[in-house]
Amino acid sequence: MANIHPLATVHPNAKLGENVEVGPYAYIEEHVEIGDGSKILPHATIFNYVKMGKNCTVFPGAVIGAIPQDLKFDGEVTYVEIGDNVNIRECATINRGTKASGRGVTKIGNNVLLMSYTHVAHDCCVGNNCILVSYVGIAGETDVDDWATIGGSSVAHQFSRIGKHAFIGGGCKINKDVPPYILCGRDPLTYAGVNIVGLRRRGFTSDQIRNIKDMYDIIYNSGNNVSDALAKIESGFLQSEERDVIIDFIRNSKRGIIRGMGSDSKGSID
C-alpha cells in the first residue's frame, strides 16, 4: 500500500500503486494514477489527468498536469502520460495537452531526467532516456526523440523536433529541427559535428560512427542542397538503421534542419 504523510492532500479516488510515498504538503488530485515505487516529495503538485509509471520521483515544487498555456484550450479533458524511472526535479513543470493540436496528450518516456525549472509545454513528446538540463523550455508540440540531451537554458520553438542521440549545447535557441546523432550549438543554432562521445557510450561501433560522420559531411560540407545530399546518401551507403533514421528525419522535417558551419566536424572516431 501507499505511504501517505498526514500533511499531504491526496484525493481518495487517486490511484496509487504499491510502495508509493507521498511527502508532506504534496497535492494529488482525483484523476491521477501513480505506479509502484514512485515518490512524490514534499510540496509537489499533480493535477488531474496524469498517469505516471513505476519508480518515478517528483521533487519539491514540481507541477505536473496544469492546464496548457494555450489560448485554444477550452477546458476539455486532456492528459499527461509519464513512463517509468523518470526524475522530475525541483520546480519543473509539465502541462496537459490540447485537443486543438490533434494530440491531446503530453508524453514523457522512460528513464527521463527533467532537471530543475525545466518546462514541457502542451502536447510535447519526450522520448526515452532523454535529459533536459536546468531551465530548458520546450514549447508546444515539440518532439524530443530517444537519447537526446538539451543543454541548460536552451529553448525550443513550437513544433520543433530534436533527433535521437542529438546533443544541444547550453543557452541555444532551437528554431529549426535538429537532426539525429549530432552536436550543435551557437546562435543561430549550427551543426558542430557528430555526437561521438554519446554514441560510443551507447555501444555504437567505430564503423557506424564513421558512416554517420560521412553522411553528415555530404549534408553539411559538400555544397549539396538537401535533396541532392539525401539522394547521394541513399545511393552511396548500404542500408542501415542510421542511414534510414537520418534520411527519414530530414525528409519529414517541417521546419527545416539547422544550418551547417562550413567546416569539418572535430573529434576522433577511432
Q: Model regions: which residues?
A:
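Terminal amphipathic alpha-helical/low-complexity segments used for targeting or macromolecular assembly
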Residues: 1-7, 12-13, 18-19, 55, ...
